[in-house]
Regions:
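Solvent-exposed loop and edge beta-strand segments that line ligand/cofactor-binding
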Residues: 16-30, 86-103, 140-158, 164, ...
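Active-site acid/base region of carbohydrate-active enzymes
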Residues: 1-11, 43-102, 115-163, 170, ...
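Hydrophobic alpha-helix feature that most strongly marks membrane-spanning transmembrane helices
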Residues: 45, 69, 116, 143, ...
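Flexible glycine/proline-rich, aromatic-decorated loop/lid segments
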Residues: 69-88, 170-184, 189, 221-238
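Repeat-solenoid scaffold signature
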Residues: 185-224, 231
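Well-ordered alpha-helical scaffold segments within catalytic/enzyme domains
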Residues: 33-49, 102-120, 159-170, 199-207, ...
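Non-catalytic C-terminal accessory modules of carbohydrate-active enzymes
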Residues: 129, 211-329
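Structured core of small recognition/catalytic domains
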Residues: 1-27, 37
Length: 329
């Protein structure tokens, strides 16, 4: 009734009692109500979920506004299961309010688009103003202008504002350089968790740092997917180090798939519904070939490339109804 969204729905488990509040409700999970309809629209070209659930989406944002103090949210799990010399669980590397408020800003930006799509001019103005106020409050609270860093300077602290457009104009390069420096300081390893992974991966990819992404993942050490494979895991595990316990069948570390498809295979949507696709494969390191396919509304799109001497040979098959444009990186 109050607009809140639980981390799991339906709630087969009720998180109640001392210390359970953040499990009962966390913005990083609740924002799915707003994000998922747009993912559905972008992939299938169907905006019906946005129209059908617009009031619910709007109500959730209104609820978060009641929980915010000066537009800052201070509850939730944060960058759950981030990595470091500590027991995995609640975010340790990155302040929970930074993560929660960044997600609050993100879904308000989505709601601007949603209001435009349903033709609600009043809401569009309201959400536009709210986004500006959250952005200003976020930077006032977490941005250290002299150092060009956010929060603790962790990888998640820096990736979130860079990816979501919270960083002050003109400071993006300096903040990005601090992110790169932190990755190198950690031996080209990540320190992010369930939430921060995606923003770290896509921040690097969108800034042309695929080589660093490849270096960060092409090893068999902890933290990394290679270690899980070496350990013998047949599904993704909840912790970067499966030996530490928790679930051995958990999809939450699977954000690297987006990099596989968008960057390595180079499959990028140019139009909602993917009736138009841009193919822009990226070569990295000693990788000799990549092959990928995805099911579209129109059929299967397949892309493969391989190195032939000092050249790259690209092949693709697209279904009828899907227009493809091949770009050279």
């Amino acid at each position: 009734p109050n607009g809140a969204v639980p981390p799991t729905a339906p709630e087969y488990v009720y998180f109640q009692g001392k210390g359970m509040d953040d499990f009962a409700e966390s913005p990083e999970w609740g924002c799915t109500l707003v994000v998922l309809p747009f993912m559905y629209y972008d992939f299938y070209g169907d905006d019906s979920l946005i129209h059908t659930y617009y009031k619910n989406m709007s109500r959730y944002v209104d609820y978060l506004a009641t929980r915010a103090e000066g537009h800052i949210l201070s509850f939730g799990l944060g960058d759950w299961y981030d990595y470091g010399n500590f027991r995995a669980g609640f975010s340790r590397n990155t302040p929970v309010p930074l993560v929660a408020t960044a997600h609050y800003y993100m879904i308000v930006k989505y709601m601007i688009r949603a209001a435009q799509m349903v033709g609600n001019n009043y809401d569009e103005i309201y959400f536009t103003n709210l986004a500006t106020e959250i952005r200003n409050a976020f930077n006032e609270k977490f941005y250290q202008e002299e150092k060009k860093t956010y929060g603790t300077g962790s990888q998640c602290s820096l990736s979130l504002p860079l990816y979501l457009g919270l960083t002050p104009e003109g400071d993006e390069k300096a903040v990005l350089n601090n992110l790169i420096a932190d990755i190198k300081k950690n031996g080209n390893h990540l320190t992010t968790g369930d939430v921060g992974n995606r923003y770290l991966f896509q921040t690097l990819a969108e800034n042309g740092l695929d080589e660093l992404m490849y270096t960060m993942h092409n090893h068999e050490d902890v933290p990394g997917y290679g270690f899980q494979q070496k350990f013998g895991a047949t599904t993704l595990t909840e912790q970067w180090d499966p030996r530490q316990g928790s679930s051995w069948n958990h999809f939450m570390m699977g954000q690297i798939d987006e990099w596989f498809f968008k960057s390595l295979a180079g499959i990028r949507s140019a139009k909602p519904g993917m009736s138009e696709v841009i193919l822009s494969p990226r070569t990295v390191g000693d990788l000799q070939y990549v092959k990928a396919s995805t099911e579209l509304l129109y059929g299967r799109l397949t892309v493969e490339w391989k190195k032939v001497g000092d050249k790259i040979e690209v092949k693709y098959e697209a279904p009828i109804g899907c227009k493809v444009k091949l770009l050279k990186e």
